[in-house]
A protein has these predicted regions:
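Extracellular carbohydrate-recognition regions
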Residues: 42-44, 134-179, 383
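Short, small-residue-biased leader/transition segments that mark boundaries at the very start
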Residues: 3-8
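Surface-exposed, short loops/turns at beta-strand junctions within beta-sandwich domains
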Residues: 10-16, 106-118
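Exposed beta-strand face motif in extracellular beta-rich ectodomains
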Residues: 15-19, 116-122, 344-346
Length: 383
């Protein structure tokens, strides 16, 4: 037979093949080499989203990756196709080329039915031909805040913003205002007369407790201790998703400041504030408990700094005067993400007197909050 008939030409199916060569010499020494061989009819290949770029996967958008294969040059238009895992219909988006790296941002991603996330798969395309490599990613969860409609309450002096005093997500200064038994009072309470839906809203009322001014407040976390009528607070809870806004409903009554000082003077109108922050704080410990942040109202150096190194996103809204009428009004606090990191914790704080940390404000100020919601899809804010 001819020499040619001894040579077999193998036509590999498109894909990545692993070949392992193992060679052992006469002395028993062994060497193993692994090769990755890419069989492809096109000049591009899909690439998984790199570990150091996981921050490019959000709840409703993600950046897809591909590459131009070495010593190959695409001859047709480059794009990506993507779909939810388990569905049949692909969507297509143009690829952006930077050297050999291909990317595309896809938006409008939706959760799977009855899930807080979804799984997507994608392939890079050259013309009408898809790369043989298919990659997947899972979107961030569209988590919501617990008891965000403030329907669950228990106890009195202190009143808890939860069904049980042993398991709560929110807390308030009620522990401090109830610590002097003869003058015990709750600053933050359930109110059935002002609400958007359900049974209650949260009412935050600023008051004078004995000789000290106390702002009506609530926050994600736990009131840890009272030291000489000063509160020590653990702020924040674990949270790894990235909403684009906090929305809710508010009614605010701004009193005339009667406990003025350095930050707001007597006779001025008091200010109410709600703020939200996401960060990767290392954690601080008090009394054996570790919290993302610990605020000691005796020490201004412990107060929250929105420009702190570990703040990944921050948004706030201040009300300089009373809201109109007796109804609640919608508000939107957008979040600006400044860092290419994924948070570990979330902080939300509301105060009927913005400068309550400094014991300044008005005993005539009250704030009602209801139906807080974390928004993940920008298009919801445009409606």
């Amino acid at each position: 037979s001819s020499a040619a008939s001894d040579v077999y030409k193998r036509q590999a199916e498109n894909g990545t093949r692993s070949i392992r060569f193992s060679v052992t010499d006469q002395r028993g020494y062994q060497r193993i080499v692994d090769w990755q061989i890419v069989a492809s009819d096109i000049a591009v290949q899909t690439v998984a989203i790199p570990d150091d770029k996981k921050y490019l996967i959000w709840a409703t958008k993600a950046t897809l990756f591909g590459e131009v294969l070495p010593e190959r040059e695409p001859q047709s238009e480059l794009s990506f196709r993507y779909r939810k895992v388990g569905t049949t219909e692909w969507q297509t988006v143009p690829a952006v080329r930077n050297g050999s790296v291909l990317t595309a941002e896809v938006t409008g991603l939706k959760n799977s039915d009855n899930e807080l996330f979804s799984e997507y798969e994608y392939q890079v395309m050259e013309g009408a031909m898809a790369s043989n490599v298919k990659c997947q990613f899972t979107t961030e969860k569209t988590l919501q805040l617990e008891n965000c409609g403030f329907e669950e309450w228990s106890g009195s002096k202190p009143m808890y913003i939860a069904a049980s005093s042993s398991d709560f997500f929110w807390d308030s200064g009620n522990h401090g205002s109830s610590s002097v038994s003869a003058f015990a009072t709750d600053l933050t309470t359930a109110d059935s007369s002002v609400k958007v839906e359900g049974k209650y809203s949260a009412k935050l009322q600023s008051k004078k407790i004995v000789i000290k001014f106390a702002a009506g407040n609530l926050f994600i976390g736990k009131y840890l201790d009272t030291q000489k009528m000063n509160g020590i607070l653990g702020w924040g809870r674990s949270f790894t998703s990235r909403p684009v806004a906090l929305t809710g409903y508010i009614r605010y009554t701004s009193g005339t400041v009667d406990n003025g000082g350095k930050y707001i003077e007597n006779g001025e109108q008091d200010k109410g504030q709600v703020f939200i922050a996401l960060g990767d704080w290392e954690g601080q410990t008090y009394g054996g408990e570790t919290w993302p942040l610990i605020v000691d109202t005796r020490d201004a150096a412990t107060f929250f700094d929105p420009k702190g190194d570990n703040v990944i996103a921050y948004g706030e809204q201040t009300w300089d005067s009373s809201t109109e009428g007796e109804n609640m009004h919608p508000f939107v606090i957008r979040l600006n993400y400044s860092l290419e990191r994924i948070p570990t914790s979330i902080v939300v704080v509301a105060s009927a007197s913005k400068y309550g940390d400094y014991f300044e404000g008005s005993t005539g100020s009250s704030m009602w909050l209801d139906n807080l919601k974390l928004v993940y899809d920008e298009s919801e804010l445009e409606e």
